[in-house]
């Protein structure tokens, strides 16, 4: 029996009001809670002892906060807004555009929605059910990828959709999927073409897609520390155990309010980013980091892991694998490693470690082993392409993962050589016609 319940609070697109978060933290800290966490879908997660639940619920209800307990029936909307300005520069998609779309989503989605710039790989493009990716060439138009619920079927929409119709089409698609669940929900034969035809009756601003979208290559930026952009700074904070001390977050919120920062952001890496720090306030932020001993320079091979939410087993396995890779001094730049411990959960990864029982008993099992799966072209925005290694016991897993990482570099080394050869042939004046 669980002695702890998890309260989930969504923040659309990972945009968090400092004053709103501060009020939540004040309320939950009255029950002597010390830590909160952030999830893969940029949501706030609060672990509460059963005996404190009634008090916490009353506090959140007083604030008018919408929340779920031990459920995710209404998933948060994921967006690349946290990367805007700092990791994404050459784009038509501005912070105001994100916010206008969020305002138009005037219902509470039951399907997972991702809203992403195409010119980035900091946030996942296709881990939602309704995945909007900004057109790299058509201003205010979006490509749409449907991943049917409880399946790995991905369908690229035949039209590109104007920003003003993103919310309405999202709502219409959700209505159709749930109204005809036998066709579109947990059905490996779901038809994207049929869903497309069923939405055409709506009054939406769209135009025919000229060509399929080419997904961007995966390059994870270093997302922690105090870093300069334009004439300001951004601060990224990662916690190894995923736990953010409430006292620290409260002071961070107050400092945001004091210095005129209107929002902070949660990210799909279970971190926070604070943008818009002025030069004159940088010292204050450094003092706050010093006060709470916030380490800012973790190894890249730790920062590129994604693990299931609410999974201590996944987190412990991550630490085990990171230690092995560190001890071996293995290079992991450019690789996103995921750990999946639950059936049909969605984890963003180039290389996925999937835990499974040899003997399944209901929702549990006995004698767990691990598969290592690789995405197409090792791009985490693509679907799984092949199994690198299957049924590994834990004592062999770390070495098998190291070998999978080596295969990543071997693959990219070969493709880069091919690209270089092709480029030279095209550019050489002596090449045969």
Locations of the language-model features?
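N-terminal intrinsically disordered, low-complexity tails enriched in polar/charged
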Residues: 1-10, 427-433
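Small-residue-enriched alpha-helical segments and adjacent helix-cap loops
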Residues: 3-150, 236-362
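General structural signal for secondary-structure boundaries
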Residues: 17-18, 49-51, 93-94, 161-166, ...
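Aromatic-residue detector
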Residues: 36-38, 46, 182-183, 191, ...
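Mobile "lid/hinge" segments at catalytic clefts and subdomain interfaces of large enzymes
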Residues: 105-202, 359-433
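Long, internal scaffold/assembly segments composed of regular secondary structure
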Residues: 177-270, 275-278
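N-terminal secretory/membrane-targeting helices
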Residues: 210-219, 246-249, 254-256, 314-315, ...
């Amino acid at each position: 029996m669980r002695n702890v319940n998890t309260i989930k609070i969504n923040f659309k697109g990972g945009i968090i009001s400092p004053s709103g978060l501060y009020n939540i933290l004040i309320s939950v800290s009255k029950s002597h809670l010390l830590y909160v966490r952030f999830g893969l879908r940029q949501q706030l997660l609060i672990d509460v002892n059963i005996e404190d639940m009634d008090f916490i619920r009353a506090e959140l209800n007083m604030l008018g906060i919408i929340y779920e307990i031990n459920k995710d029936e209404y998933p948060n909307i994921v967006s690349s807004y946290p990367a805007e300005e700092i990791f994404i520069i050459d784009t038509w998609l501005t912070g105001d555009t994100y916010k206008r779309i969020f305002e138009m989503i005037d219902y509470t989605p039951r399907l997972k929605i991702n809203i992403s710039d195409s010119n980035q790989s900091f946030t996942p493009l296709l881990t939602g059910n309704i995945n909007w990716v900004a057109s790299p060439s058509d201003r205010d138009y979006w490509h749409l990828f449907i991943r049917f619920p409880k399946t790995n079927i991905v369908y690229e929409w035949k039209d590109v959709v104007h920003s003003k119709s993103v919310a309405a089409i999202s709502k219409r698609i959700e209505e159709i999927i749930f109204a005809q669940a036998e066709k579109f929900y947990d059905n490996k034969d779901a038809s994207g073409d049929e869903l497309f035809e069923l939405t055409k009756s709506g009054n939406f601003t769209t135009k025919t897609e000229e060509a399929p979208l080419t997904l961007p290559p995966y390059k994870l930026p270093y997302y922690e520390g105090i870093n300069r952009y334009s004439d300001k700074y951004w601060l990224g904070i990662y916690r190894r155990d995923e736990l953010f001390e409430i006292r620290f977050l409260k002071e961070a919120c107050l400092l945001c309010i004091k210095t005129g920062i209107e929002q902070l952001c949660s990210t799909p890496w279970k971190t926070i980013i604070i943008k818009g720090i002025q030069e004159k306030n940088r010292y204050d932020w450094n003092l706050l980091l010093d006060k709470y001993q916030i380490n800012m320079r973790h190894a890249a091979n730790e920062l590129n892991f994604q693990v299931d939410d609410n999974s201590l087993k996944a987190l412990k396995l991550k630490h085990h694998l990171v230690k092995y890779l560190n001890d071996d001094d293995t290079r992991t730049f450019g690789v996103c490693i995921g750990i999946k411990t639950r059936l049909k959960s969605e984890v963003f990864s180039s290389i996925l470690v999937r835990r499974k029982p040899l003997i399944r008993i209901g929702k549990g099992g006995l004698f767990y082993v691990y598969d290592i799966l690789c995405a197409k072209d090792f791009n985490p925005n693509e679907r799984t392409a092949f199994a690198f290694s299957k049924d590994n016991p834990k004592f062999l897993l770390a070495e098998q993962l190291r070998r999978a990482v080596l295969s990543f570099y071997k693959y990219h080394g070969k493709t880069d050589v091919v690209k270089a050869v092709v480029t030279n042939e095209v550019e050489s004046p002596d090449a045969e016609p």
